[in-house]
């Protein structure tokens, strides 16, 4: 029986993790990337233990340790004075409790590392094939068991399964006729990378490098997130606030530190000192998410990641959930031949859709939870944070444990951090 062939539309972190997961199961994969070059934009990303566990199981521990920055704690602060509301241990605690780390990266570094692992000639299974400048514009399903992805250049890629991992505005999703579930959140995000040497030189910001932490500032209607990447080379900052009509209607734009600081008036001086060091290339864009919908497949076409469950960034789980999709889908496909793909896809959706929906819902709840106006409700929230291991109704213990994998894989997905 011929091995399964898979085509993945989309070469982002979710698509690459799916490709690598499938390769490890002995499945031949071709990745079609719409851009002329494979890569990721410059920004920070967090992988909580549920994602780190998957990547390490795919043989990536050494590559990840070479590019990671490890935060010791997650700190929550009050907007107007920087008072610490609560502190959650990360670092060694995560590795001991979840047998997997909580690490920060530059997105481009993480993307490059997974890409290299996909191509490694010494890796298990057939090396992944990559095609760039290959935007999928048509899906030919005249043969229902052999979908054909047709690119803008007219090339045709036939396989047993087409996976749409092409992001929040998925073309594959549209081509197979699934409903439009995109929802405007009412919020926008500023994303900045601030050079670490600027942080170190100023006594007002030097505290940011004294101890690596993942920090969230809570304020009425808006919040800040920041953490170091590349071991202090950059401070990654994400600032979220109510979206303006200009940003919603005009699309993403670049702004300077003046607008960034002006969006957080009267905040603690330390927050302003940090934001003032941004360059004139701060990306500002509206935030969207997908309304939960269990329809992730149609025939021999399946969706993965943001294409089926795009979520707001209030759990820092978007990429991590795509990686969980990848691990589960590869596990299910490894159990079958071509004739069993439909059943494998049904099990994939059964195991992942509810879990992803819960993370989506928790992220949406945190939109309100983070932004409670000062008063009794805010005081109650702060007291809860001081004693709880998570946020909303989703605990970190549940979230960071991840989607359960089959018992047969327990050993494979276990990697001791005891040296």
Give each language-model segment a name.
Residues 2-4, 81, 273, 294, ...:
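C-terminal helical "tail/cap" subdomain of flavin- and related membrane-associated enzymes
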Residues 9-35, 163-164, 190, 226, ...:
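Conserved mid-domain beta->alpha element of the FAD-binding
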Residues 28, 61-62, 124:
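Conserved H-loop
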Residues 38-39, 171-172, 310-312:
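Catalytic P-loop NTPase motifs of RecA-like helicase/translocase cores
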Residues 66-69, 129, 265-284, 340-346, ...:
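Acidic/histidine metal-binding catalytic segments
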Residues 75-77, 81-85, 103, 112-279:
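Conserved FAD-binding catalytic core of PHBH/FMO-like flavoproteins
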């Amino acid at each position: 029986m011929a091995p399964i062939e898979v085509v993945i539309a989309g070469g982002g972190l979710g698509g690459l993790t799916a490709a690598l997961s499938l390769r490890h199961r002995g499945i031949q994969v071709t990745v079609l990337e719409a851009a002329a070059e494979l890569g990721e934009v410059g920004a920070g990303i967090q992988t909580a233990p549920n994602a780190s566990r998957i990547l390490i199981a795919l043989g990536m521990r050494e590559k990840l340790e070479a590019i990671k920055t490890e935060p010791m704690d997650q700190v929550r602060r009050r907007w107007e004075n920087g008072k610490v509301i609560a502190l959650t241990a990360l670092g060694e605690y995560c590795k001991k409790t979840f047998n997997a780390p909580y690490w920060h990266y530059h997105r481009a570094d993480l993307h490059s590392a997974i890409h290299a692992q996909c191509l490694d000639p010494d890796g298990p299974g057939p090396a992944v094939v990559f095609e760039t400048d290959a935007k999928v514009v048509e899906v030919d399903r005249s043969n229902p068991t052999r979908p054909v992805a047709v690119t803008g250049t007219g090339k045709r890629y036939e396989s047993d399964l087409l996976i749409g991992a092409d992001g929040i505005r998925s073309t594959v999703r549209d081509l197979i006729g699934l409903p439009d579930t995109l929802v405007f959140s009412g919020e926008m995000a500023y994303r900045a990378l601030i050079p670490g040497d600027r942080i170190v030189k100023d006594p007002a910001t030097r505290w940011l490098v004294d101890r690596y932490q993942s920090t969230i500032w809570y304020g009425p209607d808006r919040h800040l997130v920041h953490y170091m990447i590349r071991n202090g080379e950059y401070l990654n900052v994400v600032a979220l606030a109510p979206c303006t009509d200009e940003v919603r209607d005009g699309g993403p734009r670049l702004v300077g530190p003046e607008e960034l600081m002006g969006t957080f008036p009267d905040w603690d001086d330390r927050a302003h000192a940090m934001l003032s060091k941004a360059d004139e290339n701060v990306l500002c864009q509206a935030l969207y998410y997908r309304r939960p919908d269990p329809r992730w497949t149609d025939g021999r076409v399946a969706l993965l990641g943001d294409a089926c469950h795009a979520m707001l960034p209030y759990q820092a789980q978007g990429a991590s959930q795509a990686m969980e999709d990848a691990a589960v889908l590869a596990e299910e496909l490894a159990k079958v031949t071509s004739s069993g793909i439909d059943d494998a896809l049904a099990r994939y959706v059964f195991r992942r859709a509810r879990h992803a929906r819960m993370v989506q819902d928790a992220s949406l709840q945190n939109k309100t939870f983070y932004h409670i106006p000062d008063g009794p409700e805010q005081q109650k929230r702060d007291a809860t944070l001081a004693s709880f291991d998570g946020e909303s109704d989703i605990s970190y213990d549940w979230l960071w444990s991840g989607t359960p994998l089959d018992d047969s894989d327990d050993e494979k997905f276990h990697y001791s951090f005891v040296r």
